[in-house]
Amino acid sequence: EKIHESYAGLNVRLRYFLRVVIERPYAMPYIKELDIAVENSQQSLVELQNDKPSKPIKLEVGIEECLHIEFEYDRGRYHLDDVILGKIFFLLVRIKIKYMELAVIRRESCGAPGTNGVAYNDSENIIRYELMDGAPIKGECVPIRLFLGPLALTPTYRSIANMFSVKYFLNLVLIDEEDRRYFKQQEVQLWRKSPEVETSTTGLGTF
């Protein structure tokens, strides 16, 4: 049983593999490697929170006298096949908004301890989709429903072997008619759920 999962990112790879080496006289040895994928369920992430459900996340963002919105995500922790639900409320709209989009961003940080505090941070958009097209009005509510299952996601990793971390953020972006961008990021924690165990109904036991 391995402590860490396999991971292939922008600057970091964590591999488990079998290596076969065949020594040959008067020739270079023959070397072959076979990668092994390791995934760990993380039910303990919930248990560490004393089985308390993750509270909704409520945030406000705005520009004085021009824009004021509130947005809400139903939780702060999601498993990799979960659905993110939320709402966006427009309380004040005095700028001309063209559209609004939501992105899932993966941020990878790496750097060994003792390197004068130098760390490398790289971000990539996993998905970006349009929530709204056209100008909203005061009092409008826009729903959020994002299915995580089809996305290429990993759990949140924190200080793996004191070498790297992986975090995920929801990035809400509004673009006005002059192509100015207003955004707000919120970190969410992802974890891997244990696979479901199917039970036979024919008396043959569990398979």
Predicted region positions:
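C-terminal beta-sandwich interaction modules and adjacent acidic
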Residues: E1-F207
